[in-house]
From Swiss-Prot:
Gene3D superfamilies recorded: Ribosomal protein l15e (3.40.1120.10)
Species name: Methanocella arvoryzae (strain DSM 22066 / NBRC 105507 / MRE50)
Lineage of the species this protein comes from: Archaea, Methanobacteriati, Methanobacteriota, Stenosarchaea group, Methanomicrobia
GO CC field: cytosolic large ribosomal subunit
Protein's name in the database: Large ribosomal subunit protein eL15
Cysteine disulfide links: none
């Protein structure tokens, strides 16, 4: 069976440092570091990933690149007396992932658009870069698209901010169902944040 062009792109991005992608990284990151936090781009860097997540080259859809700082929350160790068990240094799980932060920033930059999905495109020692697919729910070409018309409904307003994207649901523990997820539904907050 003949491999598609998208499969070759996907294979190259699996191990960027061992393929031609790694050679492009150095030049790209130098340019990206000079850019603002959120910037609109002409076309996706990873076309295979963008297409898999719902991107189409048509009116009403744009792609933006956003960068966010790397690492977890820097929490200093207490200098006052208490049990090390109660310092809260090891078992803290952050409420929002880096990817979700990037989606929210892009959503605020383009208030007339809704976040469809996002994917990783690069990182260095300080930042991670994500590309976010945004859709205009009021555009006629989106309303008439059988795959994207669902986003025109009012229930999807503010998807990124409410954690309804794929990255948002992952952070809220709602990618799984059944045994072990009892504290994740209807939400983590409803169970006093014991679900994560």
């Amino acid at each position: 069976m003949v491999k598609s062009a998208y499969s070759y792109i996907r294979d190259a991005w699996k191990n960027p440092s061992k393929t031609y992608v790694g050679e492009l990284f150095w030049e790209r990151l130098q340019e990206w570091r000079k850019e603002p936090t959120v910037v609109k781009i002409d076309r996706p860097t990873r076309l295979d990933r963008a297409r898999a997540l719902g991107y189409k080259a048509k009116q009403g859809i744009i792609v933006a690149r956003a960068h966010v700082r790397r690492g977890g929350r820097r929490k200093s160790r207490y200098s006052r007396g208490r049990k090390s068990k109660h310092m809260g240094l090891r078992t803290l799980t952050r409420r929002t992932s880096i990817q979700r932060m990037a989606e929210v920033r892009a959503s605020r930059k383009f208030p007339n658009m809704e976040v469809l999905n996002s994917y990783w495109v690069g990182q260095d020692g300080k930042h991670k870069w994500y590309e976010i697919i945004l859709v205009d729910p009021h555009h006629p070409s989106i309303a008439s698209d059988k795959n994207l018309s669902w986003i025109t409904k009012g229930t999807h307003r503010g998807r990124a901010e409410r954690g309804l994207t794929s990255a948002g649901k992952k952070g809220r523990g709602q990618r799984r169902k059944g045994k072990g997820t009892e504290k994740n539904y209807p939400s983590v907050q409803a169970h006093d944040r014991r679900g994560k």
